Amino acid sequence: MGIWKKLTLLLLLLLLVGLGQPPWPAAMALALRWFLGDPTCLVLLGLALLGRPWISSWMPHWLSLVGAALTLFLLPLQPPPGLRWLHKDVAFTFKMLFYGLKFRRRLNKHPPETFVDALERQALAWPDRVALVCTGSEGSSITNSQLDARSCQAAWVLKAKLKDAVIQNTRDAAAILVLPSKTISALSVFLGLAKLGCPVAWINPHSRGMPLLHSVRSSGASVLIVDPDLQENLEEVLPKLLAENIHCFYLGHSSPTPGVEALGASLDAAPSDPVPASLRATIKWKSPAIFIFTSGTTGLPKPAILSHERVIQVSNVLSFCGCRADDVVYDVLPLYHTIGLVLGFLGCLQVGATCVLAPKFSASRFWAECRQHGVTVILYVGEILRYLCNVPEQPEDKIHTVRLAMGNGLRANVWKNFQQRFGPIRIWEFYGSTEGNVGLMNYVGHCGAVGRTSCILRMLTPFELVQFDIETAEPLRDKQGFCIPVEPGKPGLLLTKVRKNQPFLGYRGSQAESNRKLVANVRRVGDLYFNTGDVLTLDQEGFFYFQDRLGDTFRWKGENVSTGEVECVLSSLDFLEEVNVYGVPVPGCEGKVGMAAVKLAPGKTFDGQKLYQHVRSWLPAYATPHFIRIQDSLEITNTYKLVKSRLVREGFDVGIIADPLYILDNKAQTFRSLMPDVYQAVCEGTWNL
C-alpha cells in the first residue's frame, strides 16, 4: 500500500473523529494490514487511537463502517503473502506467550526451579516409569526413582571426597570426559553434581593433549571425571592437572593410574538419601548450569555458558513441539552436544518422557531400534535424515510409531524424500546456536525453512538481516555508521538483539572472544546485537532459509557463493550420493573458486557431461564448481556436519591428492580428468577459469 493511500486512510480516520464517530472499524482494518506485514500501518493506527473520541457512541456509525470497508478494499487484489499462515501465526504467538508466563512463574521462585527439580518431580509422580534406556553394548535401562537415587548417591560421594570444595566456590565446575558406553553412570554423576549446585562441562571424548587440557582449564573445573577406557587421554595431561589441584576420578571400580581414584565402589555403597535443596540455594537463574564447547576461530574449543534459565528454555522446546509424557524419544546425538543433552535428555526429564540413548548413530540399525523400543519422537542434526534416505529401501520402511522429528540442518530435498519414504512424520525444524540468545522455529512445517517470523514475533525476538563483507566477516555500514538491512529474499548476516530477557552470556573465561560476537550500533546508537555468523534469507511470506556459515561462504568473480545452495543443486544428480562444496584459492586469482568433494552412489559412475549440463542449467557461472574430487566417504564432524577445512587446505593439488580429480572444461562441455599439465596451466594462469 502506497504512502498516499495510507495518508488518505489517516485523514479518513481523523474525519471520523471530527464527526464524533468511533474509528474502531477502520482502525481494526489497519491493524489487520499491519499484522499481515505492512508495519507502517502501525504508525497510522497509533495516530488514529490518539484521536479516539472519548465521548461518542459505542455503536459504529454507517460512516465508520464505510471507512472500514474502504480500508479493506485497499488491500491488494491478491492476498498478502503471509495471509494463508495467519491462523498458525496467531496460534503460535498465543502458545509462546502461554509458555512465557509459565516460565516466568518458575523464574520467580527462590531458589529457582531447575532440571534437578524436574527429576525429583518425576521420581515422586512416576517412580517406576522408565526414564532412560541405553542401547548398544550397555543395553540397560533405569527408572525415574532409580535415576534420582543414583544421582543422590553421586552427590553424597562427591561432597564427601571433595570436602565441600566444589560447592564452596560457585565459580568452580566439574568436567566429565566419557565414552557413550558409560551413559547411565555419567548422567547419574552429572545430576549428582547438579544437586550440589555445581556446573558441569561435557568434554568431547576424542579430545587429547593440549585441546583436552585447554577444555578443562577454560571450564574452570576443579574436578575431572573420566571414563576408564580413556585412560591414555587422561594420563597424557595428568601431571599438569594434578599440579593445578584438579581432582581426577575414574568412573569405574578400579584405577590403573596413580593419583586417580575410582568412584565405582563408593557410588554403589553410598546412601541414596535425598539431597537437601539448601546445598544449591545460592544458585540464580543466570548461574552457569552447563558448559558446552563450541569450535573457535583459534582452533581451540570455547566453553559456551548455558545458564539454568537457558537450559530450562531449551529443554522445554520438546514439550512446546508436542512431546508428551507417554512418548519415547530416540536420541543418537552425543551428550556434549546441546541437542543431545539439553533438548534430548533434559527435555525428557521436563516432560516425563522416556529417553532412548544410542551410543552413536547407525543408519542400518536406526529403524530397527525405533521399532524395538516403540520410539515416537526422533532427534536429528545435519546429515542424519539424509543418511537414512540413502539406505536401500525396505518393505517395512513405514512400519514404525514415529510421529515427530525435531532438529536442524535438514535440506529441502531430503525433507521431501524422508516424508515420502517413511510416512507423514511431523518435522519441527529450528535454528539456533549453543551460545546464541534467540532461536527460530519452523512451526508450520514449511519444507526447507529453518524458521518463521511475523510482525508480533519480530517485536518479541528482534533481529536484523544485514549486508556483510565476506572477507572480514563483518557487517557493512552506511554513511551514518549503521548496519545496512538486506531486501526480502536476499542473503544477509543474521544479528539477534541482546536484551535483558534475551542476554548473551558468552564464553567462560574468554571476555575477548565473547565481545567479538557482539555488534553495537546496528540500527541506532547504543543498541547491541549478537552476531550469529550465519547467512540466512527471509522471504516475503516470513520464512527463514539457511544459506551458509559465514566462514563457508566464498567469493568468486565478484559474487558471493553459498555452498549450501550449490550442494542442493549437485545432490539432485542420481549418480552423486553425498556432496560437500567449498572454495579453494587459485594462484593469481582474486577470491576462491568452487570445488566439490563427492561420493558416488552405489553402482553409479561419474558422468562429466551430465554434470556439466546440470550445473550450467541450474547454477550461475560464478557459482559453478570448477573442480570435482571423488572420495570413498566424506568426512563429518561428531555432530554430523560436513568437514571443509582440510579439503580447503589441500585444494586441487594433484601432487598431494590421491583421489580422482576433475576440472570443468567449457570447450569440451564436460568435466575432464585433472592431469598434471592442466594443473600446471591453472597455476600459471593459462587455463581459463
Swiss-Prot record:
Disruption phenotype: Mice exhibit a severe bile acid conjugation defect. Display a significant reduction in both liver lipid uptake and content and show a redistribution of lipids away from the liver to other tissues. Hepatocytes show significantly reduced long-chain fatty acids (LCFA) uptake. It is found in: Endoplasmic reticulum membrane; Microsome; Cell membrane. It catalyses: a fatty acid(in) = a fatty acid(out); cholate + ATP + CoA = choloyl-CoA + AMP + diphosphate; (25R)-3alpha,7alpha,12alpha-trihydroxy-5beta-cholestan-26-oate + ATP + CoA = (25R)-3alpha,7alpha,12alpha-trihydroxy-5beta-cholestan-26-oyl-CoA + AMP + diphosphate; chenodeoxycholate + ATP + CoA = chenodeoxycholoyl-CoA + AMP + diphosphate. PROSITE patterns: AMP_BINDING. Liver-specific (at protein level). In liver expressed in a periportal distribution. It is a multi-pass membrane protein. The keyword Isomerase does not apply. GO terms for cellular component: basal plasma membrane; endoplasmic reticulum; endoplasmic reticulum membrane; protein-containing complex. AMP binds at I292, F293, T294, S295, G296, T297, T298, G299, L300, P301, K302, P303. Residues 1-29, 76-689 are cytoplasmic. Its EC number is 6.2.1.7, 6.2.1.3, 6.2.1.-. Coiled coil: none annotated. The chain crosses the membrane at residues 30-50, 55-75. Gene3D superfamilies: 3.30.300.30, N-terminal domain of ligase-like (3.40.50.12780). Disulfide bonds: none annotated. Mediates the import of long-chain fatty acids (LCFA) by facilitating their transport across cell membranes. Also catalyzes the ATP-dependent formation of fatty acyl-CoA using LCFA and very-long-chain fatty acids (VLCFA) as substrates. Mainly functions as a bile acyl-CoA synthetase catalyzing the activation of bile acids via ATP-dependent formation of bile acid CoA thioesters which is necessary for their subsequent conjugation with glycine or taurine. Belongs to the ATP-dependent AMP-binding enzyme family. This is Long-chain fatty acid transport protein 5.
